[in-house]
């Protein structure tokens, strides 16, 4: 018989209904303080890894016990994941950090078939989960008790700006036949049998983003990893695995002319991607994260139906919110345009969830792709047969102990 050791952390829950607190996600006016209890079954004497492949947490939400099951997102990084930044004199510095033992998870709530979760466990639990159709955010509290976390609804984060924020889209392809309303087709992901596809994504953070986060590469790295973990979760409903293959940070200066005129910035980014980035890093799509305020209340811009195009498989996204979930929705939206998805109606709902391809971003109970978006995507696959998203970006398992720095000896090396 295998003996197991139950590792438990924390016990209590203290709701502060009606209180207000400033968190990393913003000023929250209604939240609960919770102490998640971690339960891990390990063989007796086993060495506990820093980040386990599977974890289970117990906590209370609205006074009710909840069991959160988490599984490490092993699709999050491609086999050749790299990071690039620039020295003060402009030299490219590229590394291949080991990401095998990363701290990003996806999951579900026990006994809730419609639940989802995307969580970072790098420093406490941070992310979101959907429980009984409601979206909750969780993040650590900076208290003397290091196990304290805040749980709150997205709607309880105070709005910084009431002005409507919109997405731009450039028309770069035409349909050969009129699209039927997906509502008439009564489609869902299971019925459509959407084929498995894989997107190797590059995220580029401009110099304003670098300065916004106090020139801290680690802060930007963590933010982008959390955003892509959310994107990966959204696209699972379409049978698409989104893996981050490169993070580039323009730490010295911008490599293109970044302007508020979003279309000009998009065009400049397209030229740079084709003539520079693609020559040194194989990838399927690149998204520019910029801290400049784009024109006409635009949060992002992307060409329509351009996935796998060597120049136009791109998008730009304004770093508009401290809430990584909303940034994930925005970047997933722009990526959707690259996959042929047009805008949904401004009031589009999928059940109780807001549609990701709405033209404007608003806070909702949860976010999903609509049936129309699924049909647009399926039509794009049939008409254009994009080849770059067919290959699966498998992880390479190291076969030896680490050597100096982050380098690993791979199979065949000496």
UniProtKB/Swiss-Prot annotation:
Gene3D superfamilies: Collagenase (Catalytic Domain). The modification Pyrrolidone carboxylic acid is found at residue 191. Disulfide bonds join 308-388, 348-355. GO terms for cellular component: extracellular region; plasma membrane. Its EC number is 3.4.24.42. It holds the Pfam family Reprolysin. Its cofactor is Zn(2+). GO terms for molecular function: metal ion binding; metalloendopeptidase activity; toxin activity. Residues 197-393 form the Peptidase M12B domain. The N-terminus is blocked. Zn(2+) binds at residues 333, 337, 343. Ca(2+) 1 binds at residues 200, 284, 388, 391. It is found in: Secreted. Keywords: Calcium, Collagen degradation, Disulfide bond, Hemorrhagic toxin, Hemostasis impairing toxin, Hydrolase, Metal-binding, Metalloprotease, Protease, Pyrrolidone carboxylic acid, Secreted, Signal, Toxin, Zinc, Zymogen. Snake venom zinc metalloproteinase that causes hemorrhage by provoking the degradation of the sub-endothelial matrix proteins (fibronectin, laminin, type IV collagen, nidogen, and gelatins). Belongs to the venom metalloproteinase (M12B) family. P-I subfamily. Monomer. This is Snake venom metalloproteinase atrolysin-C. It comes from Crotalus atrox.
């Amino acid at each position: 018989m295998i003996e197991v050791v139950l590792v438990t952390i924390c016990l209590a829950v203290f709701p502060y209904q009606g209180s207000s607190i400033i968190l990393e996600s913003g000023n929250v006016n209604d939240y609960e303080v919770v102490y998640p209890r971690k339960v891990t079954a390990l063989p007796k004497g086993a060495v506990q890894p820093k980040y386990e492949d599977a974890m289970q947490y117990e906590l209370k939400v609205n006074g009710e016990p909840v069991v959160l099951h988490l599984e490490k997102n092993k699709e999050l990084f491609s086999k050749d994941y790299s990071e690039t930044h620039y020295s003060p004199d402009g030299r490219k510095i590229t590394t291949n950090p080991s990401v095998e033992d990363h701290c990003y998870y996806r999951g579900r709530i026990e006994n809730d078939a419609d639940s989802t979760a995307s969580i970072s466990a790098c420093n406490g639990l941070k992310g979101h989960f959907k429980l009984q159709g409601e979206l909750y955010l969780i993040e650590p509290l900076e208290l003397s008790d290091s196990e304290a976390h805040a749980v709150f609804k997205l709607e309880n984060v105070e709005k910084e700006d009431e002005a409507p924020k919109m997405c731009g889209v450039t028309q770069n392809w035409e349909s050969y036949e009129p699209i039927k309303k997906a509502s008439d087709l009564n489609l869902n992901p299971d019925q459509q049998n959407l084929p498995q596809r894989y997107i190797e994504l590059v995220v580029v953070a401009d110099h304003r983003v670098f300065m916004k986060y106090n020139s801290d590469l680690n802060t930007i790295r963590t933010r982008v990893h959390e955003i892509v973990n959310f994107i990966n979760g959204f696209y699972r409903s379409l049978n698409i695995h989104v893996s981050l293959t490169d993070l580039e940070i323009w730490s010295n200066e911008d490599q293109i002319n970044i302007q508020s005129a979003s279309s000009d910035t998009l065009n400049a980014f397209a030229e740079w991607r084709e003539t520079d980035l693609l020559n040194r890093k194989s990838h399927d799509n690149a998204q520019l994260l910029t801290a400049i305020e784009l024109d006409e209340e635009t949060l992002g811009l992307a060409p329509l139906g351009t996935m796998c195009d060597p120049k136009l498989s791109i998008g730009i996204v304004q770093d508009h919110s401290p809430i990584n979930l909303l940034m994930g929705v925005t970047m997933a939206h722009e990526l959707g345009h690259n996959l042929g998805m047009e805008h949904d109606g401004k009031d589009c709902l999928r059940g109780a969830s807001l549609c990701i391809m709405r033209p404007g971003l608003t806070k909702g109970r949860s976010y999903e792709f609509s049936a129309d978006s699924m049909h647009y995507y399926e039509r794009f696959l049939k008409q254009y047969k994009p080849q770059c998203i067919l290959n699966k970006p498998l992880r390479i398992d190291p076969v030896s102990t680490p050597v100096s720095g982050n380098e690993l000896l791979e199979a065949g090396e000496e």
